[in-house]
């Protein structure tokens, strides 16, 4: 979210440095983007037989909420939860993220 970008300068610098250190040619990055945009596994999601949780950032502008809800609807028995924050909500708000994930895991041990 904008708040995260405005208040977490040190964290963002660390992330940017880590990304810059990756040895990824432009062609590989573009191929990755193409895969993200064109790879469609929706028809296979109904075959998932393990406990699954879809956890979405309430303010995520990269993955709209309707896509997260669609993903949830296509996985039988999946749990769905939202968390405060955007696409990087696990870094923006790690405590509630960890609580949600650990709570889900605790129910399915």
Language-model features: where?
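Conserved alpha/beta-hydrolase catalytic His-Asp/Glu region
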Residues: 1-44
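Active-site phosphate/pyrophosphate- and oxyanion-stabilizing loops and adjacent acidic/basic residues
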Residues: 69-70, 99
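Conserved alpha/beta-hydrolase "acid-adjacent" motif
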Residues: 61-67
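Active-site acidic short loop of glycosyltransferases
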Residues: 49-50, 77
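Short beta-strand/loop motif that positions the catalytic acidic residue
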Residues: 48, 54-56, 60
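Structural signal for short hydrophobic segments within the conserved structured cores
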Residues: 34, 53, 79-81
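Catalytic active-site module of serine/aspartate enzymes centered on a nucleophile-bearing elbow/loop
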Residues: 77-109
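Solvent-exposed polar/charged
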Residues: 46, 73-74
């Amino acid at each position: 979210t904008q708040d995260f970008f405005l208040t977490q300068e040190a964290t963002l610098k660390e992330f940017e440095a880590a990304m810059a250190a990756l040895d990824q040619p432009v062609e590989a990055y573009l191929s990755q983007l193409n895969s993200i945009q064109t790879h469609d596994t929706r028809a296979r999601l109904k075959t998932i037989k393990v406990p699954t949780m879809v956890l979405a950032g309430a303010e995520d502008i990269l993955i709209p909420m309707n896509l997260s809800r669609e993903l949830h609807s296509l996985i039988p028995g999946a749990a769905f939860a939202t968390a405060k924050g955007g696409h990087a909500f696990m870094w923006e708000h790690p405590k509630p993220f960890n609580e949600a994930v650990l709570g889900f895991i605790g129910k399915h041990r």
